[in-house]
């Protein structure tokens, strides 16, 4: 089925490519996996690392909508994204209920840093809840296929058996790799044979599961994806077990709470604007921007090609490096601590603090 009708021509913005849907696989009642066909001349552009995501773009009723969806296929395969329907969600309802093979969708190249190194002899711990399995599945399949001595421990939480995404794919991975994949399913609204596997993946449950069934100290890296509360609980539990925080990585799809408000000094004293230079695709543009707006929102009025998706500090699409001046980042659920220390920010959450600021999207 074709995309919703638009009342304005779709602008040709650099970074997006029209890809055909190769397959739509029903995973459960409210979720699908959408595979994209990639033309030969774009295969290098859409080569991805496990754990990355694609940003999809749709124009409807004169407005532009963007959503990011994690890739679930292993490295080297066609890009496939997992999508769960969100009530009232324009994009997810369209993808889950209407999209069919042959449809064309605007897609930006893979992005994201929630990606492991495919090194031999490593043990990766994965904790996912609900649709958070999507990038985790790509990571698990890729690291297991990369070397015969890699291992994966995966804790996967869901409400009920019929809400589990990628049931067959996980079973196939277990059959293919046997003891190298330690797979633990936990259900919150359906009793399991062993009580330890019944309940939500909160701090109490995670502490119980990890303490009883996993050699936490043997795991080299941990990868967390799911609701904010689950990932925060997992970080707390893992660091409580002595895991180095730098070895714990997390990915979020959305955050319900609004970002904190910034309390600015009197603009008559401190200045109401900054000279901001943005660098993207080798081109620099300097503009006078209000300090009351994020760098992304203000700069987009001049540079419409700036990358973005969620604008909520979650996906990381708008990541850039501050090479001059200072900004205040309201919140960050996408960048690792090391990235922030190196000067990277989410421009959708960052407001200028100094008279001059330079942000480099190419870094």
Task: Cite the ranges covered by each PLM segment.
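Iron-sulfur (Fe-S) cluster-binding modules
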Residues: 1-13, 18-20, 30, 40, ...
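Ferredoxin-reductase
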Residues: 4-104, 108, 158-161, 171, ...
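Ligand-binding loop in jelly-roll beta-barrel domains
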Residues: 75-78, 118-122, 147, 352-361
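FNR/FR-type flavoprotein reductase catalytic core
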Residues: 93-268, 272-277, 284
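Active-site proximal loops enriched in glycine and acidic residues that flank catalytic Cys/His/Asp
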Residues: 226, 234, 252, 278-280, ...
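C-terminal accessory/binding modules appended to enzymatic or scaffolding proteins
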Residues: 271-311
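Iron-sulfur (Fe-S) cluster-binding segments and ferredoxin-like electron-carrier domains
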Residues: 285, 298-307, 316-363
């Amino acid at each position: 089925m074709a995309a919703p009708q638009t009342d304005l021509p779709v602008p040709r913005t650099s970074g997006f490519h029209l890809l055909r849907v190769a397959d739509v696989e029903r995973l459960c009642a409210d979720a699908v996996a959408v595979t994209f066909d990639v033309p030969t001349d774009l295969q290098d552009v859409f080569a991805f690392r496990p754990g990355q995501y694609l940003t999809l773009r749709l124009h409807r009723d004169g407005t532009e909508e963007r959503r990011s969806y994690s890739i679930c296929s292993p490295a080297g395969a066609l890009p496939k994204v997992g999508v769960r329907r969100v009530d009232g969600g324009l994009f997810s309802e369209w993808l889950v209920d209407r999209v069919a093979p042959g449809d064309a969708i605007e897609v930006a190249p893979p992005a994201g840093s929630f990606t492991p190194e495919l090194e031999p002899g490593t043990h990766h711990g994965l904790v996912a809840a609900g649709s958070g399995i999507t990038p985790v599945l790509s990571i698990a399949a890729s690291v297991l296929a990369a070397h015969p001595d890699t291992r994966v421990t995966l804790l996967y939480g869901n409400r009920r058996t019929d809400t589990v995404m990628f049931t067959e794919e996980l079973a196939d991975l277990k059959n293919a790799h046997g003891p190298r994949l330690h797979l633990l399913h936990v259900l919150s609204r359906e009793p399991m044979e062993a009580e330890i596997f019944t309940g939500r993946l909160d701090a109490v449950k995670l502490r119980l599961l990890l303490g009883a069934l996993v050699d936490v100290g043997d795991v080299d890296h941990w990868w967390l994806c799911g609701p904010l509360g689950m990932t925060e609980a997992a970080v707390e539990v893992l660091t409580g077990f002595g895991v180095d925080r730098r070895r714990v990585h997390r990915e979020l799809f959305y955050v319900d709470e609004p970002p904190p408000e910034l309390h600015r000094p009197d603009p008559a004293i401190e200045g109401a604007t900054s000279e901001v230079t943005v660098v993207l695709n080798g081109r620099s543009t300097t503009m006078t921007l209000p300090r009351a707006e994020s760098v992304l929102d203000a700069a987009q009025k001049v540079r419409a090609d700036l990358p973005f998706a969620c604008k909520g500090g979650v996906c990381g699409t708008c990541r850039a490096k501050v090479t001059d001046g200072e900004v205040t980042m309201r919140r960050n659920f996408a960048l690792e601590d090391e990235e922030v220390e190196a000067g990277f920010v989410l421009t959708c959450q960052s407001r200028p603090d100094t008279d001059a600021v330079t942000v480099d999207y190419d870094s």
